[in-house]
Swiss-Prot record:
The keyword Magnesium does not apply. Probable beta-1,4-xylosyltransferase involved in xylan biosynthesis in cell walls. The keyword Glycosyltransferase applies. Its EC number is 2.4.2.-. The gene is GT43A. One of its GO terms (cellular component) is Golgi membrane. It is found in: Golgi apparatus membrane. It is a single-pass type II membrane protein. Residues 43-371 are lumenal. It comes from Oryza sativa subsp. japonica (Rice). GO terms for molecular function: galactosylgalactosylxylosylprotein 3-beta-glucuronosyltransferase activity; xylosyltransferase activity. This is Probable beta-1,4-xylosyltransferase GT43A. Glycans are attached at N176, N299.
Length: 371
């Protein structure tokens, strides 16, 4: 009797102890699982915001693409000061990009201007090829593409996918152009008007969409303080002709100009006789050399601050022909003209010209209905 009573009293104690062990194991399992998954959670709320696109640290340092399509009835070279101040753009020619690689810190912005002309079916390929080149250039770089308003839609689609920061300018010319050169001249003036109006400070270069560039070319022209020039090789597919034109240099100092035709081996050269000879004219008193737009670059501040570079007037040119004004300044003020690269012995720009295809329309003979 006594033994049976003791066994009956110990059974509730065993049941209680087994329940306690089960509860302990359950709590331990829950804590282990929560601790395991908590280890994969981010340590701060900022990482969650970054992952959701709320401006965290995963955003790129430099904007890759920007579209600015402007359709203008008339282009004026007189800048709008109020618009420039509202845009918050200064007059300095150096842009701090916050990149400490190589210890450079600050680099001048490159303003690459491209005019569009030629056949539309060839234009897309040329723009994409130049875009691939510009993507290899270290920022800051802005690509200014100019063209008539009628072709703006197709070109805008191409530019959006290039990954290059760009400004797309479409304009309606006031006159009908008789030649492709006249149209390109007007487009360059439209681009310079945009650069002046918005105070885009940097080094301006006119890059042909059909041009081929050395990988180090854009790093070289970024070092330009005022004006720079270099040899350019022009290859013509139709005439099978190769011509190299550019400056004669002593180190980085320009001492003359030359033109060499590799087909017949002839070379023409014009050298400066004295330091004061800024315009080496012939007997007739005319300029002995003209410089192609693809063979020079300049500091954009000459457009709105010419007195800084020794020009007597506050306006670039009363005729609003900015590209002509800049070409004259580059040739006249050779004390500020830098040859690129040093001693100008290397060709870094190639221009490839192709003949324009003229499609003749063949008319079918008219047949008269006979009754």
């Amino acid at each position: 009797m006594g033994t049976a009573a003791v066994a009956a009293a110990e059974r509730p104690k065993q049941r209680r102890s087994s329940h306690l062990w089960k509860k302990a194991l359950l709590h331990f399992s829950l804590c282990f699982v929560m601790g395991f998954f908590t280890g994969f959670a981010p340590s701060s709320s900022s990482s969650w915001r970054a992952g959701s696109g709320g401006g965290g640290g995963v955003q790129p340092r430099h904007q890759l693409a920007a579209s600015h399509v402007a359709v203008n009835q008339q282009v004026s070279l007189v800048p709008d000061a109020a618009a420039a101040e509202a845009a918050g753009v200064g007059n300095g020619a150096v842009v701090d990009v916050g990149d400490d690689e190589g210890g450079e810190g600050a680099r001048r912005m490159l303003i690459v201007v491209t005019t569009t002309r030629g056949e539309r079916r060839r234009r897309r390929g040329e723009l994409l090829r130049l875009a691939h080149t510009l993507r290899l250039v270290r920022p800051p770089v802005v690509w200014v593409v100019v063209e008539p308003a009628a072709d703006a839609a197709a070109t805008a689609e191409v530019l959006r996918g290039t990954g290059v920061m760009y400004r797309h300018l479409a304009f309606r010319p006031e006159e009908n152009f008789t030649t492709a050169d006249a149209e390109a001249h007007a487009q360059r003036n439209a681009a310079l008007a945009h650069v002046e109006k918005h105070r885009l400070s940097g080094v301006v270069h006119f890059a042909d969409a059909a041009g081929v560039y050395d990988a180090h070319f854009f790093d070289e022209i970024r070092q330009i303080e005022a004006f720079g020039t270099w040899p350019v090789a022009t290859m013509s597919a139709g005439e099978k002709k190769v011509v190299v034109e550019g400056p004669l240099c002593s180190d980085s100092k320009v001492v003359g100009w030359f033109s060499r035709d590799f087909n017949d081996g002839t070379t023409r050269a014009v050298t400066y006789n004295t330091e004061a000879d800024l315009n080496p004219a012939g007997a007739a008193g005319t300029r002995a050399h003209t410089i192609d737009v693809s063979g020079f670059a300049f500091n954009s501040s000459i457009l709105w601050d010419p007195e800084r570079w020794g020009r007597p007037t506050s306006l670039p040119d009363t005729s609003q022909d900015s590209i002509k004004f800049v070409q004259e300044v580059v040739l006249e003020d050779r004390t500020k003209l830098k040859g690129i690269p040093s001693d100008c012995s290397q060709i870094m720009v190639w221009q490839y010209t192709m003949p324009m295809q003229v499609h003749a329309q063949t008319s079918t003979p008219k047949t008269h209905n006979r009754r």
